[in-house]
Curated annotation (Swiss-Prot):
Protein's UniProt name: Transmembrane protein 151 homolog
Disulphide-bridged cysteine pairs: none
Region of interest (Disordered), ranges: 498-535
GO cellular component: membrane
Keyword Repeat: no
Native source species: Caenorhabditis briggsae
Coiled-coil stretches noted in the UniProt entry, renumbered to this chain: none
Chief subcellular location: membrane
Length: 535
C-alpha cells in the first residue's frame, strides 16, 4: 500500500475544474461587468421607447415631459451603451490575443516536448552588471513671465562598466531529473499544460558547493565598481522553455475555440458565457520540471559517495560553541579507535598469561570528579576484579547481552592475587574500587603499558569488543556504548592555582604576624631595661 501511494503521488494527471472553481479563479470580471452594463442600457432604452415613445418623431418638440425618459435624458443610455460596447470589444480582443499567443499542439507533441525537458541538463546561471553614476550638466530653457531663461540642470547618468556571467558546475555532485510522470492526457479534448522549472539539493554537500560557487562569483565582481545588479535563473539546454501549452486530442481544435465562433458570441454580448464554458471544458495540468543536484554523493557506485549523513557530521556550529561555553569537553573515540582497542592490547610485546573472559555486570555509574585526580575510564560493559576479603559475595549475573563489550580490567600485583583469581573467587565490578592498589587510568588516544603509576595490562584482563558472529554496531551506537573520558582541564588547573595562591597568602600572613609579634616583644624588653639604667 505504501509503494502504491508513493507511485500515485509521483504521477501528474490533468483535472477538469467544476463551475464553482472556474467562477472563483477565472471569473472574467471585466467582461461580466461590461456585459451587464450593456444589457442594462439596452433595457433602459427599450423601456423609454415602448412606454413613452421617446425616440419617435410623432410628438411635438415643444411638449415637455417629466421623468427619466424626458427629452435629453433618453439619449444618455444610448451614448453610455456605445462607449461601453467599444470597451467591451477591446477587452474581448485582449482575451483572444492571449489564446492566439498560446502554443497549440497535439497531445503527442506535448508529451514529446515534456520528455525533452526532463532529459535536458539544467543550466543554473548568474549574471552581474557593475555600474556607477556620473554627474552631468545640461542647458535647459525655461519660461518666466513670457521670457526665455536658460538654466543649467544637473543630473546623474548610469554607466555600466562591467558585465559578467557564470553558471553552476555540477560535474562533481551530479544531477538527476525527479519530475513526475504524466498520465491520462488523452482522455480530454483540450488540456492546458502549465510548465514551471526548479531545482533542489539532495544533501548538504551539494547545497554547500552551489553556495560556494555562487558567492565566489558575486564576491569577485562586486569590487569592480560602486554598484552591482544581480540576475540569476535556470534554463534547460537545447530546449526552449514555454510556460503554457494548449494540447488538443483531435487534429482540429474544438468548436468553442474557433475564432469565428468567438467573435460571433462577442458581438452578441455573449462572450462571458462562452469563456466560462471554454474553461469548464478545458482540463488543467500543472507540471514542474525538477532537477536534483547531489546524486553522486548518494550513489555507492560513485567516487564521490559520502554515505548516509549522521547527526554528528551535520551538527551545527552553534551547538558546538554552546558546549565549549559550558566546558563540556568530551574526548570521544572514533569508530576505528573503538574497534581497534582490543588489537592494540593484543599486539603489544608484554608477556600475557592465559586468556580469560569475564562476564560484564552493568552497575549504576557514580558521578565523575571535577578534577583530574583518580579519573578512571568507564566503558560500557567494563568489569574489574576486586582483591579483598569481602569479595566472596557473588553478584548474580544478568542474562547475556547482545551488545558489544569493552575492555576488562583486573588488579594483579603478585602471585597471590593471580592464584586468587584462578580460584574463581572474584567479584565483577563495572568500576574499579578504591583500595590499596593505585587506580589505573586509560587514555583514548593510545594505550601504554608503561604509563607512570600504572601497571601492565594482562591478556586475561581483556576480552574482545564484539562476539565473532556479531556484526559491528553503527557509529552512533558505538559512541553511546563507549563512555567518553570527561576531563575539565581548565577547572582543575584553575583550582590548583587558586589553592596554591591561597596557601601562599596564608603563609605570608602568618610570617608577617610572627615578625610583628617579635618586634613588639623586643621593644617592650628594651623599654623595661632603660628605666633601670637611668637612676
Amino acid at each position: 500500500m505504501a509503494g502504491t501511494a508513493d507511485c500515485q503521488e509521483h504521477v501528474a494527471r490533468p483535472r477538469r475544474p467544476n463551475i464553482c472553481r472556474v467562477l472563483r479563479r477565472t471569473g472574467y470580471g471585466k467582461c461580466l461587468i461590461c456585459s451587464l452594463l450593456l444589457v442594462l442600457c439596452f433595457f433602459y432604452a427599450t423601456y423609454c421607447h415602448v412606454k413613452h415613445e421617446a425616440y419617435s418623431g410623432s410628438q411635438p418638440l415643444l411638449i415637455y415631459q417629466h421623468g427619466p425618459c424626458a427629452q435629453g435624458y433618453n439619449f444618455v443610455p444610448i451614448v453610455f451603451g456605445l462607449m461601453l460596447y467599444i470597451v467591451y470589444l477591446m477587452e474581448c480582443w485582449h482575451s483572444r490575443t492571449k489564446i492566439i499567443n498560446m502554443k497549440k499542439v497535439r497531445v503527442e507533441d506535448a508529451l514529446d516536448y515534456i520528455t525533452a525537458l526532463r532529459t535536458s541538463p539544467p543550466i543554473v546561471w548568474w549574471k552581474s552588471v557593475c555600474y556607477h553614476y556620473t554627474r552631468k550638466t545640461r542647458q535647459v530653457t525655461r519660461y518666466r513671465n513670457g521670457d526665455a531663461v536658460s538654466a543649467t540642470q544637473v543630473y546623474y547618468e548610469r554607466v555600466n562598466s562591467h558585465q559578467a556571467g557564470s553558471m553552476f558546475i555540477y560535474d562533481t555532485c551530479g544531477f538527476r531529473d525527479i519530475s513526475k510522470s504524466i498520465l491520462e492526457v488523452e482522455k480530454f479534448h483540450v488540456t492546458r499544460i502549465r510548465l514551471t522549472r526548479s531545482f533542489v539539493f539532495a544533501n548538504m554537500q551539494a547545497a554547500t558547493e552551489f553556495e560556494q560557487q555562487r558567492s565566489r562569483f558575486f564576491n569577485d565582481n562586486e569590487t569592480k565598481d560602486d554598484y552591482m545588479e544581480v540576475r540569476e535563473g535556470m534554463d534547460l539546454s537545447d530546449v526552449g522553455f514555454v510556460e503554457e501549452i494548449l494540447a488538443f486530442n483531435c487534429p482540429t481544435p474544438p468548436w468553442f475555440l474557433h475564432p469565428i465562433v468567438f467573435w460571433f458570441f462577442s458581438i452578441l454580448v455573449l462572450s462571458w458565457p462562452l469563456r466560462i464554458y471554454t474553461e469548464w471544458r478545458t482540463a488543467v495540468l500543472s507540471f514542474q520540471v525538477v532537477k536534483l543536484f547531489g546524486t553522486h554523493y548518494l550513489s555507492p557506485n560513485s567516487i564521490n559517495y559520502t554515505g548516509p549523513l549522521t547527526r554528528t557530521s551535520t551538527m551545527d556550529t552553534v551547538e558546538l560553541e554552546a558546549l565549549l561555553r559550558r566546558e563540556q569537553h568530551f574526548v570521544v573515540p572514533s569508530y576505528s579507535e573503538v574497534m581497534l582497542m582490543q588489537n592494540t592490547i593484543a599486539n603489544s610485546n608484554t608477556n600475557f598469561p592465559n586468556l580469560r573472559f569475564l562476564e560484564p555486570v552493568i552497575q549504576p555509574r557514580p558521578l565523575v570528579n571535577t578534577t583530574n585526580e583518580h579519573i578512571v575510564l568507564r566503558n560500557y560493559g567494563a568489569t574489574d576484579t576486586e582483591n579483598s576479603e569481602q569479595s566472596s559475595t557473588v553478584i548474580p549475573r544478568p542474562p547475556p547481552l547482545r551488545v558489544s563489550r569493552s575492555m576488562t580490567f583486573a588488579e594483579e600485583n603478585n602471585d597471590e592475587n593471580l592464584g586468587f583469581l584462578e580460584n574463581g573467587n572474584r567479584r565483577n565490578r563495572a568500576i574499579p574500587s578504591r583500595g590499596t592498589v593505585p587506580l589505573r587510568s586509560l587514555s583514548i588516544g593510545g594505550i601504554s603499558a608503561w604509563s607512570n603509576g600504572y601497571r601492565e595490562i594482562g591478556r586475561e584482563d581483556s576480552q574482545f569488543l564484539i562476539e565473532p558472529d556479531e556484526p559491528p554496531p553503527p557509529y552512533e551506537v558505538a559512541l553511546r556504548m563507549c563512555a567518553p573520558l570527561y576531563e575539565r582541564l581548565r577547572r582543575s588547573i584553575s583550582s590548583r592555582l587558586a589553592s596554591i595562591s591561597h596557601s601562599s597568602s596564608k603563609d605570608l600572613k602568618s610570617l608577617t604576624l610572627k615578625n610583628n609579634n617579635g618586634a613588639a616583644n623586643n621593644n617592650n624588653n628594651n623599654n623595661n631595661e632603660n628605666p633601670e639604667e637611668q637612676p
